[in-house]
Every structure is written in C-alpha cells, then in structure tokens.
C-alpha cells in the first residue's frame, strides 16, 4: 500500500468499529526514523497501537547488538504509539535472541509480544523465562500453523488466521487458557483442512493469497485480487480452499 492508502485503511477500520475495538497498525518502514514517521501517520489516522516489524535488511544480514532496542525506543518516543514486539522466525537473521526480547519488553511503550519464532525448542525454553521476567507482558502467538502447540502458553493469537476463522480460534484460546487439551485438539482437527489449504504451501506468502480466497468463501471479500509481488495461486487452489472452509463449517457471514 502507498502511505496514503495505509492511512485510509486505518481510518476505515477505526470508523467501522465505532471505537469499540482497538485498531493495530503494522509499522514496517526500513529505517528507524522512517518507521517513526510511519507510526506518527498511524496515530494521526486513529491507530491505538502498532506492531513494529524488524528492519528487513536484518533478514539477510543480521543486526548489531542494541539496534532493535533502539528502533523500539525511537519509534515510541517520537510517535507515542504503544508498540507490540514482533519476534520473527528462527530461520531468519532478524529473529531476536532472548536478551534482546527481554530488553525490548522492558522498554516504555512496549505492552505485548507477537511471537512467531517457529522453533518449538526456543518456544518451550524462552516463553517461560519471558513470563517470569515480564509478567505484565501480553504474549500472543503468531504461529498460524502451530496454534495447538502454542495455545496453552499465551494470552491470545495475533495471526492472519483470525481473519477467516475467528470463532473457532477464540474457542481455542479459551481451551488453551483452561488447559483443555481435548477441546483444543478437536478444534485443531476441525480446522486442519483449512490450515493445510492456506498455510501448508510452498511459500508462506502464498498463504496471504490463500487467505483472500478464504475471505471470499466467507462472503467478506468479493474477489481475491492481489498486487505484485504477490501472484495468483495455481488453478484449482480456489476450489480447494472453498472446500476446506466448508469442511471446517466456516460458512458465509452477514
């Protein structure tokens, strides 16, 4: 989206929820000052908080010690926008080590963490430490394809999956908080056809396109058009996704 389109989307969502729900803006600018300006525009458009992405040059080259902490500090100080810490997958060089996570989560303005480390050894090791050291931090799973494993350790989900299946995901969060594995497993199994058709693809970016087809199946979007560099899915994918949504009993809304 262009900068103007980003602001328009935030304003449209703020208007549509009539101030009943907080609107979280993704802050993705590469440079720290650029990200701070993006956060200021989000505040002006009505966003309640921001999900601050890592600088994407770090994906390939890694980051200098202290740079992520500085990014969160500057963006919050210059914009006043409350921030969600975003943990990237362990297979990238933009993933934060435990010390960095603890440092950022202790900084002013950081109130939650969206954790998508996608390494269950790290998850099982680091989440208990973060819980102990930062008890007031909201921990949100980013693991669309691993919700069952992570549901028992979190305060909620911050996942694209929530766009297409909010009803069963809310049930799964409740089951996780209650320690009800049987219920959580039932929901996992019910959703598995959707999980496979949307997220078990060659690229996670294909899941973004697949999500749009699922939103069409639910009657939320009229079409699944995407912009480059995203591309349409292969022939037959639309039917596969619609069939999976029906199998999971996720019908049209409204």
Task: Map each language-model feature to its residues.
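Residues within well-ordered alpha-helices
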Residues: 38, 100, 145-146, 211, ...
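Active-site beta->alpha loop and helix N-cap motifs at the rims of alpha/beta catalytic domains
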Residues: 1-95, 231, 251
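A general structural signal for well-ordered alpha-helical segments in protein cores
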Residues: 6, 10, 35, 72, ...
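Catalytic alpha/beta core domains of metabolic enzymes, predominantly
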Residues: 74-78, 89-195, 199, 203
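C-terminal alpha-helical cap/extension of soluble enzyme domains
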Residues: 153, 168-254
């Amino acid at each position: 989206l262009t900068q103007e389109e980003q602001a328009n989307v935030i304003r449209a969502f703020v208007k549509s929820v009539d101030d009943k729900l907080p609107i979280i803006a993704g802050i993705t600018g590469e440079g720290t000052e650029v990200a701070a300006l993006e956060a200021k525009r989000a505040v002006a458009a009505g966003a309640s908080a921001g999900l601050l992405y890592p600088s994407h040059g770090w994906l390939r080259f890694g980051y200098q010690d202290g740079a992520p902490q500085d990014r969160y500090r500057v963006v919050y100080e210059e914009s006043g926008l409350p921030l969600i810490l975003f943990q990237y997958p362990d297979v990238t060089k933009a993933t934060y080590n435990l010390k960095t996570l603890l440092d950022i989560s202790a900084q002013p303005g950081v109130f939650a963490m969206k954790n998508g480390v996608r390494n269950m050894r790290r998850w099982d090791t680091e989440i208990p430490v973060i819980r102990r050291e930062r008890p007031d931090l909201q921990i949100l799973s980013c693991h669309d394809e691993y919700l069952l494993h992570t549901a028992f350790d979190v305060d909620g989900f911050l996942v694209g999956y929530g766009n297409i299946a909010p009803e069963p995901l809310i049930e799964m969060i409740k089951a996780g908080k209650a320690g009800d594995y049987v219920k959580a497993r039932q929901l996992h199994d019910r959703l598995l056809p959707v999980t496979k058709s949307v997220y078990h693809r060659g690229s996670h970016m294909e899941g973004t396109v697949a999500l749009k087809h699922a939103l069409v199946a639910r009657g939320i979007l009229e079409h699944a058009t995407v912009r480059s560099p995203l591309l349409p899915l292969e022939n037959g994918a639309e039917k596969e996704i619609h069939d999976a949504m029906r199998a999971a009993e996720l019908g049209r809304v409204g």
